[in-house]
Swiss-Prot record:
Highest classification ranks of the organism: Eukaryota, Fungi, Dikarya, Basidiomycota, Ustilaginomycotina
Compositional bias of kind Polar residues: 398-425
Record field: compositional bias (Basic and acidic residues): 426-445
Record region (Disordered): 328-365, 379-459, 525-555, 569-589
Biased composition (Acidic residues): 536-545
Protein name (database record): Putative uncharacterized protein UM10309
Classification via InterPro entries: Chl4/mis15/CENP-N
One Pfam entry name: CENP-N
Example GO biological process: CENP-A containing chromatin assembly
């Protein structure tokens, strides 16, 4: 929220799209980011769309030679490329368009020649602010994942706007005009609103762009060339929603960035901006958390109670935000989100167990649900686990006398050759492996939906999420294989509510697709291995009926599959910690 606007009656300049930006090293660097084919395509667009925001190219004032009219040969056009001076400027727009679409697009012509042609011949005085902004956005259009976007939310006053839908009253053009008036109190700037393709023109696939799903605002400081041609602040407003995707900055520090977002909130009729709640870790985050009041507002009046949602794919973030029941807050009830929310199918429909025998969050896709309990053995997959090599003590036993070997019989290795199984056993294991694979595929389809066509991955119904973070408050399992009881009293540790609990984070380019593959591959199962001797303690008294079976040999120990040691705490009723009293962060989204 803007607290202290400029007291000056005369506002600072808000540059228009047609204002001139002289050539500079920064502008040359911005031009050099594009490939030569992209430069040719962009210049062709400038020549075809002669709008008021574009500066027209400089043409030659020489009259065409007798009998030549406006058409020229390719040889003459090549001379125009190699001889960069006024004498070689084109006489008409058609001639210039022919130059850029013909010889200039030849791969033998270097990109440096095209850059020199723009800066010295066709646009020697400079480009407009709109043309500079298109240079930046043309680069981002072809590289959709080149920026990292974070989510903020516009907060509206319920007393003024009871419906909380003030963002629907203003169009993107009105917001741009009001935003320019607000920013004029603080610094000289330029705001570029990227035009979206009209719905009736979207039939042609060539004109579609991922930016058409947003109202794209690019804000830069002016008039210094390094600021005009710099990164700037990019704001993607989801139309008819209070959500913004933000990337970039204005100058050094975060003051100008927060000031511009507060001005955007005022332009959209909102009272303040809601940022992601800072995670305690750094000294700056701890200081900011200490400054927040009971309502979660900082000294500037900005709220910081929103759950963190960021990523490189703006369309994936948009898909999450557009769902009316989506939740970004870490304290929100994830079970309230329907099947369409990021999480995919039934994997998002987990209900928290309130006691009893009902399924809870511990039965989700990351932990094998109760319905998927099966024999924990690799033989279901048609694989017989090999016997580990003999330890040093076992090798010594072989070389000792017969009296010593009788006290501890040597373990016999199991042969892995095909002749080690009868045909009936081989056939049975093959049938069991096939049944298991079909069951795993069925469960993956139930949890995450059907697998997409590998030749058309765009039809995948799973939303692309780059990070899923869980904060679970549950006791640590008593894993005797790690000798935890010899290090710390786990009972006392788990009974202390102040002790840190378990946090789980999954990251990747497509987390849900990865989980679907793991479930389909049967990696949520477990196998067994031979005990290396670390299992000591209370577990030694269990399963007395099997003690004689493994007497004289090494007792097998269960190995957990995906997600590993969390399988051991399934009986502890894993639950997510409920929201503290008075916490309204679950309503932020």
């Amino acid at each position: 929220m803007i607290l202290q606007p400029s007291s000056s009656k005369s506002k600072l300049t808000s540059h228009q799209d047609h204002h001139l930006v002289p050539h500079s090293i920064s502008l040359r660097r911005l031009l050099s980011r594009l490939d030569k084919s992209e430069l040719v395509s962009l210049v062709t667009r400038w020549l075809d769309n002669a709008g008021p925001s574009y500066i027209p190219p400089m043409l030659s004032r020489r009259q065409p030679k007798a009998g030549q009219e406006d058409s020229v040969t390719n040889l003459t056009l090549y001379h125009a490329i190699l001889d960069l001076n006024e004498e070689r400027r084109c006489r008409s727009m058609d001639e210039l368009r022919l130059l850029w679409t013909g010889p200039m697009s030849d791969p033998r012509v270097p990109k440096a020649r095209a850059l020199d042609r723009i800066s010295d011949v066709d646009w020697p005085e400079g480009l407009s602010y709109a043309m500079v902004a298109e240079l930046d956005l043309f680069y981002a259009h072809a590289r959709q994942l080149s920026k990292t976007w974070s989510t903020v939310k516009l907060e509206y006053d319920d007393d003024v706007d009871a419906a909380g839908r003030g963002w629907e009253r203003l169009s993107e053009t009105q917001i741009r005009l009001r935003l320019g008036n607000e920013l004029g109190h603080y610094f000289e700037h330029h705001i570029y609103l990227h035009p979206r393709v009209k719905p009736e023109d979207r039939n042609a696939a060539a004109v579609r762009s991922w930016t058409d799903s947003f109202s794209y605002f690019r804000i830069v400081l002016a008039p210094i060339p390094s600021d005009v041609c710099g990164t700037g602040l990019h704001i993607l407003h989801l139309p008819r929603t209070p959500f913004l995707l933000v990337s970039g900055s204005l100058g050094r520090g975060s003051e100008n960035r927060e000031m511009a977002l507060s001005a955007f909130a005022a332009a959209a009729g909102a009272t303040t901006v809601n940022y992601a709640k800072p995670a305690a870790g750094s000294a700056a985050a701890k200081k900011l958390l200490a400054e927040l009041n009971d309502a979660g507002e900082d000294a500037a009046g900005n709220r910081r109670t929103l759950g963190e949602l960021r990523g490189k794919d703006p369309l994936a973030l948009r898909e999450i935000l557009l769902h009316e029941s989506g939740r970004l807050s870490s304290t929100s009830d994830a079970s309230a989100a329907p099947a369409g929310v990021a999480g995919g199918g039934k994997a998002r429909q987990m209900q928290f167990s309130q006691g009893g025998s009902g399924q809870g969050a511990e039965d989700g896709p990351l932990i094998a649900p109760l319905k998927r309990r099966r024999e924990e053995d690799l033989s279901l997959l048609g694989i017989r686990p090999p016997t580990p090599p003999a330890s040093g003590s076992e090798r010594d036993t072989v070389s000792l006398s017969s009296a010593s070997t009788s006290a501890r019989p040597t373990q016999r290795r199991s042969s892995l050759t095909p002749c080690s199984q009868t045909p009936q056993e081989t056939h049975q294991h093959a049938r069991e492996a096939l049944t298991t694979r079909m069951e795993s595929q069925r469960e993956a389809n139930e949890l995450f939906g059907p697998k997409p066509n590998p030749y058309d991955p765009s039809n995948d119904a799973l939303p692309r999420v780059e990070r899923i973070e869980y904060e679970l408050h549950l006791p640590f399992p008593a894993m005797q294989r790690y000798n935890t009881r010899s290090l710390i009293d786990m009972d006392a540790y788990n009974s202390d509510p102040e002790k840190p609990k378990i946090k789980l984070r999954l990251e990747g380019t497509h987390v849900l697709a990865g989980l679907r593959k793991l479930v389909a591959a049967g990696m949520d199962r477990s196998t067994s291995r031979l005990d290396a001797g670390e299992g000591q303690g209370d577990d030694d008294d269990e399963e007395d009926g099997q003690a004689e079976k493994y007497e004289g040999a090494v007792k097998p120990v269960k190995l957990d599959g995906l997600p590993g040691w969390l399988t051991e705490v399934r009986g502890t009723k894993v639950v997510v910690q409920p929201s503290p009293p008075g916490d309204d962060s679950s309503r932020d989204m």
